[in-house]
């Protein structure tokens, strides 16, 4: 494991948990050759210091890789992943960040759900574990982003 997740106890102090982004979950679920080891180790390390959290958007996006809800729930067990509702404030913040993104020339192909995930983490004082850190760092600068690059 690289130093990307160094000092987790300090970085997660005061955080309510770690929101786990879709790409990390899919890396592990699909045993993605490039990232499965990093993502699995990152999940294990984060779980030592804070609850792992998912929300309905993450659950929905991960669900496309599973045939049944039972298989999905086995992959994302409730005793490992805390399931949090989305706060209304996160919807407002997501919309504002998405609008700023579009005004900067961002393509509509980038889905609003990515912004909703970042907003959820920001509003609820969660860190986010992701491999796609650029957008989170740009539009949610106070968010604690845990990624291979940092």
Where are these regions (language model features)?
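Short, structured coil segments at secondary-structure junctions
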Residues: 79, 139-141
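Short, flexible loop segments at the rims of nucleotide/cofactor-binding pockets, characterized by
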Residues: 29-32, 61, 104-108
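Alpha-helix capping/helix-boundary segments
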Residues: 24, 58, 90, 116-117, ...
């Amino acid at each position: 494991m690289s130093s990307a997740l160094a000092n987790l106890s300090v970085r997660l102090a005061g955080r309510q948990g770690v929101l786990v982004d879709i790409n990390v979950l899919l890396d592990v679920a699909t045993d993605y050759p490039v990232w499965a080891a990093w993502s699995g180790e990152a999940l294990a390390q984060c779980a030592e210091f804070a609850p792992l959290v998912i929300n309905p958007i993450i659950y929905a996006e991960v669900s496309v890789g599973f045939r049944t809800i039972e298989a999905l729930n086995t992959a994302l067990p409730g005793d490992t992943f805390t399931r949090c509702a989305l706060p209304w404030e996160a919807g407002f913040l997501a919309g504002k960040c998405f609008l700023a993104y579009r005004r900067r020339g961002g393509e509509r192909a980038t889905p609003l759900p990515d912004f909703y995930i970042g907003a959820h983490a920001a509003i609820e004082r969660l860190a986010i574990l992701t491999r796609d850190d650029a957008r989170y760092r740009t539009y949610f600068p106070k968010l604690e982003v845990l990624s291979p690059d940092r």
